[in-house]
């Protein structure tokens, strides 16, 4: 069974009934030569006590899909790559909000790339395919949802740009939505305007609706009846009981200005509820079973009560938990150069969110090699985000970065990538690390701000400073409030998380997730307007600390020097088996990188004298003999017809016996000795570059110069 839709001259095909038939839902999504198998499976029984949708999404790229064999010793796919993690998150975000309340069945969706073409669409197909698989399955799902990518070339929007179009595009936007509205946005841009972004969403949604209609057609042909959700009763009764116990105390606890104090007060209220409600009498009344532990049910109901209080306070009273107005930004402090041995460092604090950001400059040896289905990619700019457990007062083991950390780091990296200088302008590999020391909302945007400060402190000539802010939304009926610089609580209990980063001129990165059925373009415009005001305010605050990149690099950063040589001279620098270049490195301690085709030699060292020494050695190796010039050369070999003299490193010339002296010489060894330093003049360089020397002309010229001086 399959349905199809033509997009840009190629068919989007959704096929079911052939692959993976033991799943709850399975769809093969095809476009051009790109095939993605999308499957969903849900457990048959629910899990009790969950306050979230137990959904796991995994995206995997099979090496065989691009005709490749994986590298490494084992020659098979290993742990998920960063790209696979990022696409997994991209699929998850528009799908998760569409599961109904009370859905407690563990569910897994897997998107496997089986064939990889040059359409640049595997991630988009995965979102469409997972949604289609859920739509035709028996799993309750308030979809379907669809996605497209939007590019922009010469001020025209392009739907699902291929690899060639993507290279020219100034916009890279993934938009997902339902039939009614856009629900997820992620992308980057070369300083685009807010108006352009809104128009891009409208353009995207027009095509999203066509793909949703295609999924509904597939559902009509092969959809299964949806299973009923077995929900546990008693939640409303528990909420009423909670209000009877602590109703008069919630407001005082919820509106304490500090996060730690607020959380402590709320924890005390929760404990009071647990002590009063997790009793035999209440359990018997609620479930007819006094042995049942209902602490999880009480905790979940308590969370809903607090959520309702916070939202009503914002919508009806205009009061946020920390006392701010809806468009007010928390206090900001910026510090730079705080770590003496680090090439660039900054501490950015916004309210109770704090990022310590460090910049390290390296050479081409430090570039990150990324294996992808499209081939090897070398990254010269990297940003890594670390969320440390103490930042929220927790005790957790330190492990490898999780999905959230990789996603936040990528968002911040994307925001800054548009202002990072090209390799020709700044020949360094740049690594930025953001360690979150405190967190109460918007740590990824604090990373963007801190990274900008750190890069400028390191002397990286970025095109413009970048700042970011997280926006939120509370929607109750017809009333909506857009929040600027949201707290963690406002993110958790709110209806939207919208992160916007950019320069003074425009937006460079954005990420939006809507937890409700969608938002209108009017609300979206308002959020963008508030975000721009906040961004400009933050940029101004950052400029008070540092307004442009430092002119000098850190004393401890490597200096990179470029030398242009003839490409044919590269082999002389390297030497047989790398002997010459290794010798230079051992003697000077520098790093040397050679671009063979261009004839560019890069020398890197934090010690300027060592770098200059290496430069002189390389210049000596690559310089060519100059006709008519006198050199002090070393006799390297004596032969019957003359001698070979090295006039510069790697350059030898023939000194014929007739050119040794004015008088006739019987044996060369009577006049010259191996290793002897003698003056010689270059008298000929033939077409093959062979050099002929004359000692007698050199002596004669030196004698004439001396006589002239006296």
From Swiss-Prot:
Gene name, Swiss-Prot/TrEMBL: pnp
GO MF term set: 3'-5'-RNA exonuclease activity; magnesium ion binding; polyribonucleotide nucleotidyltransferase activity; RNA binding
UniProt cross-references to Pfam families, sorted A to Z: KH_1, PNPase, RNase_PH, RNase_PH_C, S1
Protein name as it appears in the record: Polyribonucleotide nucleotidyltransferase
Domain S1 motif residues, every copy: 628-696
The entry's keywords: Cytoplasm, Magnesium, Metal-binding, Nucleotidyltransferase, RNA-binding, Transferase
Lineage, opening ranks: Bacteria, Pseudomonadati, Nitrospirota, Thermodesulfovibrionia, Thermodesulfovibrionales
Binding positions for Mg(2+) per the UniProt entry: 491, 497
Example of a GO cellular component annotation carried by this entry: cytosol
Organism: Thermodesulfovibrio yellowstonii (strain ATCC 51303 / DSM 11347 / YP87)
Family affiliation: Belongs to the polyribonucleotide nucleotidyltransferase family.
């Amino acid at each position: 069974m399959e349905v199809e839709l033509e997009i840009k001259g190629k068919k989007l095909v959704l096929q079911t009934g052939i692959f993976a038939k033991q799943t709850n839902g399975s769809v093969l999504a095809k476009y051009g030569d790109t095939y993605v198998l999308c499957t969903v499976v849900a457990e048959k029984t629910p899990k009790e006590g969950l306050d979230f949708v137990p959904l796991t999404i995994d995206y995997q790229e099979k090496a065989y899909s691009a005709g490749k064999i994986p590298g490494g010793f084992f020659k098979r796919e290993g742990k998920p790559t960063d790209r696979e993690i990022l696409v997994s998150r991209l699929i998850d975000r528009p799908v998760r909000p569409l599961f109904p309340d009370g859905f407690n069945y563990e569910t897994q969706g897997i998107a496997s790339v089986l064939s990889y073409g040059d359409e640049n669409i595997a991630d988009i197909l995965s979102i469409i395919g997972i949604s289609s698989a859920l739509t035709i399955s028996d799993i309750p799902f308030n979809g379907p949802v669809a996605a497209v990518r939007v590019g922009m070339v010469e001020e025209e929007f392009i739907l699902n740009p291929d690899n060639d179009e993507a290279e020219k595009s100034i916009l890279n936007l993934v938009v997902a939505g339902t039939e009614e509205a856009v629900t997820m946005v992620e992308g980057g841009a070369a300083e685009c305007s807010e108006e352009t972004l809104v128009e891009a969403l409208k353009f995207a949604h027009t095509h999203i609706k066509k793909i949703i209609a295609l999924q509904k057609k597939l559902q009509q042909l092969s959809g299964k009846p949806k299973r009923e959700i077995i929900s546990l009763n008693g939640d409303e009764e528990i909420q009423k009981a909670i209000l009877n116990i602590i109703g008069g105390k919630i407001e005082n606890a919820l509106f304490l200005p500090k996060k730690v104090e607020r959380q402590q007060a709320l924890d005390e209220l929760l404990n009071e509820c647990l002590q009063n409600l997790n009793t035999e009498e209440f359990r018997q009344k609620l479930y007819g079973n006094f042995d049942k532990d209902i602490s999880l049910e009480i905790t979940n109901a308590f969370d809903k009560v607090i959520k309702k209080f916070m939202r009503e306070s914002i919508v009806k009273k205009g009061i946020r938990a920390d006392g701010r107005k809806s468009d007010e930004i928390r206090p900001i402090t910026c510090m730079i150069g705080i770590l003496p041995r680090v090439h660039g460092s900054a501490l950015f604090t916004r309210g109770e969110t704090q990022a310590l950001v460090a910049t390290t400059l390296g050479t081409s040896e430090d570039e990150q090699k990324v294996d992808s289905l499209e081939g090897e990619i070398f990254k010269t700019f990297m940003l890594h985000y670390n969320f440390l457990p103490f930042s929220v007062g927790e005790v957790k083991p330190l492990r490898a970065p999780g999905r959230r950390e990789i996603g936040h780091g990528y968002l911040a990296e994307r925001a800054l990538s548009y202002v990072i200088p090209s390799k020709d302008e700044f020949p360094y590999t740049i690594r930025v690390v953001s360690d979150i020391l405190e967190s109460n909302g918007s740590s990824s945007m604090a990373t963007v701000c801190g990274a900008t400060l750190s890069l400028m402190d390191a002397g990286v000539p970025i095109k413009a400073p970048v700042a970011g802010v997280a926006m939120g939304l509370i929607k109750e009926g017809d009333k909506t409030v857009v929040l600027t610089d949201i707290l963690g609580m406002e993110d958790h209990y709110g209806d939207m998380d919208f992160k916007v980063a950019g320069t003074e001129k425009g937006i460079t990165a954005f990420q939006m997730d809507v937890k409700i059925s969608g938002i209108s373009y009017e609300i979206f415009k308002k959020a963008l307007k508030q975000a721009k005001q906040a961004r400009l305010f933050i940029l101004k605050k950052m400029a008070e600390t540092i307004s442009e990149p430092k002119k000098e690099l850190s004393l401890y950063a490597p200096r990179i020097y470029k030398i242009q040589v003839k490409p044919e001279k590269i082999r002389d620098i390297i030497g047989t088996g790398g002997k010459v270049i290794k010798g230079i490195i051992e003697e000077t301690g520098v790093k040397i990188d050679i671009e063979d085709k261009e004839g560019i030699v890069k020398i890197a060292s934090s010690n300027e004298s060592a770098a200059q020494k290496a430069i002189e050695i390389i210049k000596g190796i690559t310089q060519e003999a100059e006709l008519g010039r006198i050199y002090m050369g070393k006799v390297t070999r004596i032969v019957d017809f003359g001698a070979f003299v090295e006039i510069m490193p790697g350059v030898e010339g023939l000194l014929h016996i007739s050119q040794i002296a004015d008088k006739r010489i019987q044996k060369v060894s009577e006049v010259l000795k191996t290793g002897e330093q003698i003056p010689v003049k270059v008298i000929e360089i033939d077409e093959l570059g062979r050099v002929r020397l004359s000692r007698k002309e050199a002596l004669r010229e030196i004698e004439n110069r001396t006589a002239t001086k006296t």
